[in-house]
């Protein structure tokens, strides 16, 4: 617990937040810091206790008084803080590096007699894996090497080996602790005596092969011969060498750490996770001997080629999808009006000999293959020719997201026999469903133009049903920006109606919708951008002075009426005589008693 002083150069923000106070029955402390802020650069930490602010004792201050005191500091902020005691950290557990130490127990000098063996070329003293340093029984289980995987279980009698049984090999006492044996070789255990014959200890049994071809039999016999003779050709990596120190005069712990590490790394090369198509070591050895190691790879390649040949090209798939998505052409009765024609989803009217503007059907929902109608304004002639699909899609028109235009649902015959909402008769055959009612297709007509609305959009207005064109002509309001009819959500502002996408903020371009907005030079601004561009910031709390807020001007700044207070006692100075020191307002009591 140490005290220290901090002097932060103004202006605000200072980069920290307070918590506590007299009203919370807890001392004022630093609750949070802003990354890279002035407080963080001054080595202020979270949890430090604030003792004084600009020379005033902070122990009796409430939270609001301390906040106003800090806000009143404009040029610089001087504070005295008390460092919070650091919580004791648990000591880290040391990580053991390197190999664990071996515990070697004293053993008698005279080692037990080791029976003579004829050869040590193929001896496998490797034991079953166990944690380092563990003590096990002297019995050793021999693990066959990959080269001896196909040796017969019983030693066969050959012309080079004696018919007498081979004695079992007893490992030295040092093998019990997981280390290689280091023993003096006696006269009867000389290297020349150890290389007199061959042995086969604990080799796996292989069943007799009776139904294989002659070539496979020869390859298997060759593998058996290499395994029994200790051939130096290995299937997985370089051959392993036993590390034995000879001609030592005393027993000691062998220093084989580097070699053991290397051999341990070689043994664990195949311990990584395998995928579903990776074979184990035994299967790879068998595949190499039988010559089938590349068979599955070729089969996998053929399968990939077959799959690739079956996948259609992107252009073909897109063309098929577009063909499937095209609706069936339906003939609809038309009246004598020269502006309405039955079109497909991608059709649009193309003006001829005029500079009219094509109006896209804004009521149409995306991904809906339905007929649409177009209307050309300021044009004297109409043409029934159909323009390309991209001619209508390339134009950017304001879209009505919440459109009022609906479409009738076509129901085939045979499912049910509803009642027509127009004639109140039973419908036999296909019918339409709209607004929760059923209609004869020939009786679902516009209330004004009497055209069928079976394949076009309709809008319900004052209890009657109108087609899209009649509703747009007689009922739909006009947008104050694009001068087009609004078929969806209407924004009413500034005594005009707007599309949602047309009534946007001038600064950020986002739709204002029903939110608060401000006008500046006749242009609408959202609340955030307006205060950022044109708003007045209070010098005390650094918040904008909104419309309707009481404010005053003093010392060349603008203040909220509640923010213009004495920097020491936080007494309101509105309408009172005040003094100023370094742009900080002071009351009469503290004008000459406080030095900044």
UniProtKB/Swiss-Prot annotation:
CDD domains named among the record's database cross-references: LIM1_ENH (cd09453), LIM3_ENH (cd09459), PDZ_PDLIM-like (cd06753)
Residue stretches of biased makeup (Basic and acidic residues): 258-273, 293-304
Cellular compartments per GO CC: actin cytoskeleton; adherens junction; cell projection; cytosol; filamentous actin; membrane; postsynaptic density; presynapse
Name recorded for this polypeptide: PDZ and LIM domain protein 5
Entry keyword rRNA-binding: no
Organism: Homo sapiens
GO biological process terms held by the UniProt record: actin cytoskeleton organization; cell growth involved in cardiac muscle cell development; heart development; muscle structure development; regulation of dendritic spine morphogenesis; regulation of synapse assembly
Residues recorded as bearing N6-acetyllysine in the entry: 89, 350
Region (Disordered): 121-165, 196-240, 255-340, 354-381
Assembly notes: Interacts with various PKC isoforms through the LIM domains. Interacts with actin and alpha-actinin through the PDZ domain. Interacts (via LIM domains) with SIPA1L1/SPAR; this interaction may occur preferentially with isoform 1.
Gene name as annotated: PDLIM5
Bias-annotated ranges (Low complexity): 144-165
């Amino acid at each position: 617990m140490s005290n220290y002083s901090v002097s932060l150069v103004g202006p605000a923000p200072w980069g920290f937040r307070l918590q506590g106070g007299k009203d919370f029955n807890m001392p004022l402390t630093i609750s949070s810091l802003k990354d890279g802020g002035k407080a963080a650069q001054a080595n202020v930490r979270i949890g430090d206790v604030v003792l004084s602010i600009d020379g005033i004792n902070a122990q009796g201050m409430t939270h609001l008084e301390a906040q106003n005191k800090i806000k009143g500091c404009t040029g610089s902020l001087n504070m005295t803080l008390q460092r919070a005691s650091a919580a004791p950290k648990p000591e880290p557990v040391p990580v053991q590096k390197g190999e664990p130490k071996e515990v070697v127990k004293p053993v008698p000098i005279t080692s037990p007699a080791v029976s003579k063996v004829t050869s040590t070329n193929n001896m496998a003293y490797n034991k079953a894996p166990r944690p380092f340093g563990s003590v096990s029984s002297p019995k050793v289980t021999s693990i066959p090497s990959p080269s001896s995987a196909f040796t017969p279980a019983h030693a066969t009698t050959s012309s080079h080996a004696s018919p007498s049984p081979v004695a079992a090999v007893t490992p030295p006492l040092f093998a019990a602790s997981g280390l290689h044996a280091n023993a003096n070789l006696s006269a009867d255990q000389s290297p020349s005596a150890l290389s007199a014959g061959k042995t086969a200890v604990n080799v796996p049994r292989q069943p007799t092969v009776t139904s294989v071809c002659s070539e496979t039999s020869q390859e298997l016999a060759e593998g058996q011969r290499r395994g029994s003779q200790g051939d130096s050709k290995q299937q997985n990596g370089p051959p392993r060498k036993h590390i034995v120190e000879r001609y030592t005069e005393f027993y000691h712990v062998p220093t084989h750490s580097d070699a053991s590490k290397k051999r341990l790394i070689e043994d664990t090369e195949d311990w990584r996770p395998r995928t579903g198509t990776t074979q184990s070591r035994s299967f790879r050895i068998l595949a190499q001997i039988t010559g089938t190691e590349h068979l599955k790879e070729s089969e996998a390649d053929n399968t990939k080629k077959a799959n690739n040949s079956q996948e259609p090209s992107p252009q073909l798939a897109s063309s098929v999808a577009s063909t499937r998505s095209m609706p069936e052409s339906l003939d609809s009765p038309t009246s004598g009006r020269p502006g309405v024609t039955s079109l497909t989803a991608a059709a649009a009217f193309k003006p001829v000999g005029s500079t009219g503007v094509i109006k896209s059907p804004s009521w149409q929902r995306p991904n809906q293959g339905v007929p649409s109608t177009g209307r050309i304004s300021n044009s004297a002639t109409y043409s029934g020719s159909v323009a390309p699909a991209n001619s209508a899609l390339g134009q950017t028109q304001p879209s009505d997201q919440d459109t009022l235009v609906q479409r009738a649902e076509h129901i085939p015959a045979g499912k049910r026999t509803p009642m027509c909402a127009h004639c109140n008769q039973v419908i036999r055959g296909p019918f339409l469903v709209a607004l929760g009612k059923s209609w004869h297709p020939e009786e679902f007509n516009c209330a004004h133009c009497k055209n069928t609305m079976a394949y076009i959009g309709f809008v319900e207005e004052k209890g009657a049903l109108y087609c899209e064109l009649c509703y747009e002509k007689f009922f739909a309001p006009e947008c104050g920006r694009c001068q087009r009819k609004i078929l969806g959500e209407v924004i009413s502002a500034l005594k005009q109606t707007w599309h949602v996408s047309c009534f946007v903020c001038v600064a950020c371009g986002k739709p204002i919708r029903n939110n608060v907005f401000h006008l500046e030079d006749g242009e609408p601004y959202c609340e955030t951008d307006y205060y950022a561009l044109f708003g007045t910031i209070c010098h005390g709390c650094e918040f904008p002075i909104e419309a309707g807020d009481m404010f005053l001007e003093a010392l060349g700044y603008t203040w909220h009426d509640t923010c213009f207070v004495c920097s020491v006692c936080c007494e309101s100075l509105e309408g009172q005589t005040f003094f100023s020191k370094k742009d900080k307002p002071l009351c009469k009591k503290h004008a000459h008693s406080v030095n900044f």
